[in-house]
Amino acid sequence: MVADNSEKSTKSVANGSLISTVSSKDDLPNAIIVTQVPEDVFDNKQDKANFSSLFTQIEKDIHFDFLRSFRRVRVIFSSPENATAAKLIVQGFSFKGHELKAFFAQRIYMSANSQMLSPPPLEKQFLISPPCSPPVGWEQTKDMPPVVCNFDLMARLASFAIDEKYEVHNGDELTPAIIVHPCETPIDVPSAIEMPRTPRPSSPCEQ
């Protein structure tokens, strides 16, 4: 009795899982795959039309996928009820001496979320060549002018006119004026300081 109860509970669990998986009508398959299809169906237009009429009598607007390499045909219906009716008709049906077999095909769900890589966000897309229209409200930034020291500029200009004096800072009531009087470097002044040479130490032979 214990074994029977466990077996019944196992069946109930299995049935419960089966019911939960097909609780929605959208989970049922709406397509079948017909196997052992004669080669004449793929080559002869009339045989293909006769084969298609087996399913168009159930539903007119259906889709066929003729898989010649596998000798199979996938038939997609609009509802699971029509797919079930077509499977019952085709299963064991003899067509041009070949017994057809059919089984349900897995339902294909078209997802709106693409698994492909998406383009970059729009805030920097206008910087990519070729440039496109910038976003609304975007304004061109102005570059800051170069910072030039007046003292350095005046010193550079004064180097070209040695004989002329130039005023670095204008004097006012609180600070005196700064005037630079350039002068030429005397010719006899050495350009560099001479460093004394270190004598070479004597060798043992010289001693």
From Swiss-Prot:
Domain of life: Eukaryota
Recorded phenotype for the gene knockout or disruption: Slightly shorter body length as compared to wild-type. Reduced calcium responses in AFD neurons upon a temperature increase from 16 to 20 degrees Celsius as compared to wild-type. At 17 and 20 degrees Celsius displays cryophilic behavior, preferentially migrating towards colder regions. RNAi-mediated knockdown disrupts tail tip morphogenesis resulting in retention of the pointed larval tail tip in adult males (also known as the Lep phenotype).
Gene Ontology BP terms: calcium-mediated signaling; positive regulation of nematode male tail tip morphogenesis; response to hermaphrodite contact; thermosensory behavior; vulval location
Region (Required for tax-6 interaction), start-end ranges: 176-181
GO molecular function, one term: protein phosphatase 2B binding
Pfam families linked: Calcipressin
Site for May be required for inhibiting calcineurin activity, residues: S129, S133
GO cellular component terms listed in the entry, alphabetical order: cytoplasm; nucleus
Consequence when changing S129A: Resistant to serotonin-induced egg laying, a behavior positively regulated by calcineurin activity, resulting in a reduced number of eggs laid in a tax-6 (jh107) gain-of-function mutant background
Tissues with expression: Expressed in lateral hypodermal cells, marginal cells of the pharynx, vulva epithelial cells, ventral and dorsal nerve cords and commissures and various neurons in the anterior and posterior regions. Expressed in male tail structures including the diagonal muscles, sensory rays and spicules. Expressed in PHC neurons and most tail neurons and support cells of the phasmid neurons. Also expressed in pharyngeal muscle, head neurons, excretory canal cells and hypodermal seam cells.
Assembly and binders: Interacts with tax-6 (via catalytic domain); the interaction is calcium-dependent.
Family statement drawn from the similarity comment of this UniProt entry: Belongs to the RCAN family.
Protein function: Inhibits tax-6/calcineurin A phosphatase activity and thereby negatively regulates calcineurin-mediated functions. Plays a role in modulating temperature-dependent calcium responses in AFD neurons and in addition, also negatively regulates thermotaxis in a tax-6-dependent manner in AFD neurons. In response to changes in intracellular calcium levels may also regulate nuclear translocation of transcriptional regulators such as crtc-1. May play a role in regulating body size. Plays a role in male tail tip morphogenesis.
Name of the protein described by the UniProt record: Calcipressin-like protein
Gene that encodes the chain: rcan-1
